[in-house]
Amino acid sequence: VSGPVIRAAAKLGVPTAVHEQNAFPGVTNKMLAKKVDRVMITTPAAQDYFKAKHPTVVTGLPVRGEMLRADRDLSRAELGVDGRPLILSMGGSLGAKAINDAVKHMILSRYKDKNCYYLHATGSNGAGMIDELSKEIDLKENSHVMLREYINDMDRCMSAADLVICRAGASTISELQVMGKPSILIPYPYAAENHQYYNAKDLADNNAAVLIEEKDLDGEKLTAIVDLLISNMDKLKQFGENAKKMAVTDASERITNCICEIVK
């Protein structure tokens, strides 16, 4: 939608800028890059895909303020979580069947050990998973298994987590980075130009996440990777530290500065 407007504005000499959220740019932004005054990118990984009129500027992607302010210890206390690792998993607001199925297998395989907490959001399309698991697990007696349809306190849940299993949308990636969270990323395979794969690969290449393509995902594989990570907390900590190194915590300010520079 914005493509024709930006192109017309640039032709008229009106200051113009674009911002690319993903590690693999969309067609429109790549085309506009040759015309606009500023190309802002979320991650340096996107740099090589642009043939821009002016040098690209890494601004990061703004995240909600509550994600920046969340306190891990307070969040864990509010969730009733003790010192055991907390695994947070989700597949988006609608849910993702492949992720739900794999997480269900993982929980059923591991919950009896009671050495971890599991907080899983099924999404609206997967809400039946809660009833299915409640028939196999006494959730009152196993309070370390926490199932929800939707997470409306993401700042609290992600802050409290020791490992996050999720998709690889741009906003989610930025939140993982600013919070310094290790993750297992399962990109949505039908995203435009497969951009979630490249977002996940960016973290995996920086030793900040494990990337599993959905076509390769099953319960046994997910469980094995979780076992490997949870049994090596030093590695998990390193993943989190590497994610934090990639974070841009002043993205809004950087974007504002770029815009102000071209309208002076």
Predicted segments — roles?
Residues 154-195:
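A donor-sugar binding/catalytic signature common to diverse glycosyltransferases
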Residues 72-74, 80-164, 197-201, 205, ...:
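Donor-nucleotide binding loops and adjacent catalytic segments primarily
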Residues 1-12:
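An aromatic- and histidine-rich active-site surface loop
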Residues 226, 230-234, 259-264:
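Short, hydrophobic alpha-helical segments
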Residues 37-38, 55, 156, 163, ...:
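Well-ordered beta-strand positions
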Residues 10-73:
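Active-site-proximal region of nucleotide-activated glycan assembly enzymes
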